[in-house]
Amino acid sequence: MARDYKIEDYRNFGIMAHIDAGKTTTTERILYYTGKSHKIGEVHDGAATMDWMEQEQERGITITSAATTCFWNGKRLNIIDTPGHVDFTIEVERSLRVLDGAVCCLDANAGVEPQTETVWRQADRYKVPRMVFINKMDKLGADFFNCVKMIEDRLGATPLCVQLPIGSETEFEGVIDLIKMKELVWKGEGLGAEWEERDIRADLADKAAEYREALVETAVEQDEAAMEAYLEGEEPSEELLKSLIRKGCIALAFNPILCGTAFKNKGVQPLLDAVVDFLPNPTEVPAIKGIDFKTEEEVVRRASDDEPTSLLAFKIMNDPFVGSLTFARMYSGHLETGISLLNTVKDKKERIGRMLLMHSNSREDIKECFAGDIVAIAGLKDTTTGDTLCDPMKPVILERMEFPDPVIELAIEPKSKADQEKLGVALQRLAAEDPSFRMKTDEESGQTIIAGMGELHLDILVDRMKREFKVEANVGAPQVAYRESLSQKGLVDYTHKKQSGGSGQFARVKIEFGPGEPGSGFVFESKIVGGNVPKEYIPGVEKGLKSVMDGGLIAGFPVIDVHAMLVDGAYHDVDSSVLAFEIAARAAFREAKSHCAPKLLEPIMKVEVVTPDEYTGGVIGDLNSRRGQIAGQEMRGNATVVNAMVPLANMFGYVNNLRSATQGRAQFTMLFDHYEAVPKAVEQEVIAKSA
């Protein structure tokens, strides 16, 4: 069967932003205007179509990125709605990995907020072309031009205004389209509100002409012929100008800026036009690269139905009716139900039984899909996030995704012994869905420990266990996920000998330990020359060292950023084995404790507090008392923004303190920034607690 839409008519894009910038409302309006939603859902009354989990509807925030397909002007739009809360950055990361373009929503009053910077950096990493929708232009304090300046200053981006607002706050009427040089004015604020094109009013004509000139000057830089014609006094046509803006947006040269108010139904249709006009189709972004499963050489998969089939699983979700759903992006080829694909990461075959097109939480069965599609596949057994599914005859592993380590953990146990097994199943299912959620069993206490990206993250997971899996659990107080590392270099020479009749065990290792680069994890190298330690025993040394990393040296926390170099050793023809060298390496690492001054590291959070001016002194004093380092403060509108670096250990319960100290008028956001050595007094306290 042929495809309904040419691949050139696809737009795979996401909507990303800081929490409360109006992403979900914008998506709701898009779904309404593209004819997919019969009634509009409001986030305020918990009925938004994209927010389909109970917790999302209660809390008014988006937790899981729901994928949906809709149509506009003969183009097929696959939209992924992403969460803006910092605890769910992993969802944003996963979405960006499989998208071709993005719309970044800003709150016209707040402008660029901390989470905006985070998602923008993530999009930079994946080289995603994006445009900006300055939303909430009707809000008190809305300032379009300040937002544009913040995009430049804070994001280091090149904003290109393709619209200007007509009025702001309660006076916001519509926009000036700088490409057509016309006003678009909405009549009323009702659903499906009509708008009309008008000539630009006299008092805005100069401003419009100034921004139009800047727009054209930037756009013609994308094409020499267009630039020459412009320099000779020839204005580009509307079509040429659109194609130049498209070219620059896709090349990441600049970001088109639009504005409106999704809640009041103004500016959404022109935003949809801009998605079609400026964001790339799957053939206009670089082809995805991968590694040939057999030869380990780099291979490229172009976005074409004629290429071998390859998909990337980017999200696992438990659906109450269908069971486990795997969301996947079809990068190349064509797929029908009933076919078996190879999961190259797990080296297992998966049969494609049922494929669905998702519209938020309703679904439509499909029999086949093509390059560029985003589909949900039901019933895959072994596939997890980041796995590649492909044609077994042309196996490939597509680029993996990187997932951050959790920074907060807590103990959890079922309220009744009967729920023990259900708890295990629930946690495994949740961990399969969310790679930033980890679980382990504490060997000493036997407790189950869960770890995640923040208090809200773990709150919601515990809540989901109760609702979806009917498991009631007791939860301990949140604990900081400390790490350990080494402060200095040290040389350890260790010999492992064991003789108990027959062949014994013998291995000698001489290892130089030292601190590694931040973020390097564990780096092992061998400088053995001349067979003092035979080649086949060296992997045993590495394995032994790695086994100590998880258990820690001083307080039982995982060891990070260590460089270990095997410089010498000795073996015995009969008594040496891989196991003997593994045991020797393990003991050598433990002995490094007395040579390399191990240290405890704690997660340091980047905190931003936005507070009314009169509370600034109190907010700064409170952050200082939490061992915080104030990084700076600035005015934003009539509020003060305080930036600080604060240890996570001192931030538990901060939200309630801030609320009572500022009568609920201040807000804060917190992001993990880096690990740092703990002060000695605190270190001793933590070690004593963990003993």
UniProtKB/Swiss-Prot annotation:
The answer on whether this UniProt entry bears the keyword GTP-binding reads yes
- Family matches, as Pfam families: EF-G_D2 (PF22042), EFG_C (PF00679), EFG_III (PF14492), EFG_IV (PF03764), GTP_EFTU (PF00009)
Q: Which protein family is it in? A: Belongs to the TRAFAC class translation factor GTPase superfamily. Classic translation factor GTPase family. EF-G/EF-2 subfamily.
Q: What organism is this sequence from?
A: Maricaulis maris (strain MCS10)
Organismal lineage: Bacteria, Pseudomonadati, Pseudomonadota, Alphaproteobacteria, Maricaulales
Q: Where in the cell is it found?
A: Cytoplasm
InterPro entries, alphabetically?
A: EF-G-like_DII, EFG_II, EFG_III, EFG_III/V, EFG_IV, EFG_V, EFG_V-like, G_TR_CS
Q: What is this protein called?
A: Elongation factor G
Instruction: Give the residues the record marks as binding GTP.
Output: 17-24, 81-85, 135-138
Q: Which SMART domains match?
A: EFG_C, EFG_IV
